[in-house]
Amino acid sequence: MTTSSYFLLVALGLLLYVRQSFSTHEHTCQLDDPAHPQGKCGSDLVNYHEEKCEEEEARRGGTNDGGKKRRRASPLRKRRRFISMLKARAKRRGYQGIACECCQHYCTDQEFINYCPPVTESSSSSSSAV
């Protein structure tokens, strides 16, 4: 085996390893896949995801500050954005994401929290400065 083909083989193996290491989705779904009996779909998925994200945000820094709540996006706007994201993903042939992970399959609460936007330090520090 020549040095260049050996190098190519090692590079491809490393690339495959990195791809699998950074993949956060466990499943790939098709549009005709049935929903899991315990999966959350549609508005149930949106409501449960929003609830878990708010609980996680409160656990990490609290959301009792009225000023902070006013600066957050309205729940209706967040819901519309989330639903449009789900529709865009559903148009693909094979898709991954929260709809695949938590509707066609079952998600734990921790898996739902993994789909929440990160709590930024600026929002935590601004609430302490008010």
From Swiss-Prot:
Q: Which Gene3D superfamilies match?
A: Insulin-like (1.10.100.10)
Additional notes on this entry: Venom insulins constitute about 1/25 of the total venom of C.geographus.
Q: Quick one: signal sequence residues?
A: 1-23
Query: Which key words are in the record?
Result: Carbohydrate metabolism, Cleavage on pair of basic residues, Disulfide bond, Gamma-carboxyglutamic acid, Glucose metabolism, Hormone, Hydroxylation, Secreted, Signal, Toxin
Write one Gene Ontology MF term: hormone activity
The chain residues annotated with the modification 4-carboxyglutamate are 111
Q: Which GO terms describe its biological process?
A: glucose metabolic process
**Compartments in which it is found:** Secreted
Family indicated by similarity: Belongs to the insulin family.
Tissue and organ expression note: Expressed by the venom gland.
Q: Where is the composition biased (Basic residues)?
A: 68-77
Region: Disordered, residue numbers: 54-77
Its subunit composition reads: Heterodimer of A and B chains; disulfide-linked.
The top of its lineage is: Eukaryota, Metazoa, Spiralia, Lophotrochozoa, Mollusca
Instruction: Please explain the role this protein plays, according to its UniProt record.
Output: This venom insulin, from a fish-hunting cone snail, facilitates prey capture by rapidly inducing hypoglycemic shock. Intraperitoneal injection of this peptide into zebrafish lowers blood glucose with the same potency than human insulin. In vivo, when applied to water, this peptide reduces overall locomotor activity of zebrafish larvae, observed as a significant decrease in the percentage of time spent swimming and movement frequency.
UniProt protein name: Con-Ins G2b
GO cellular component, as recorded: extracellular region
**Propeptide residues?**
59-92
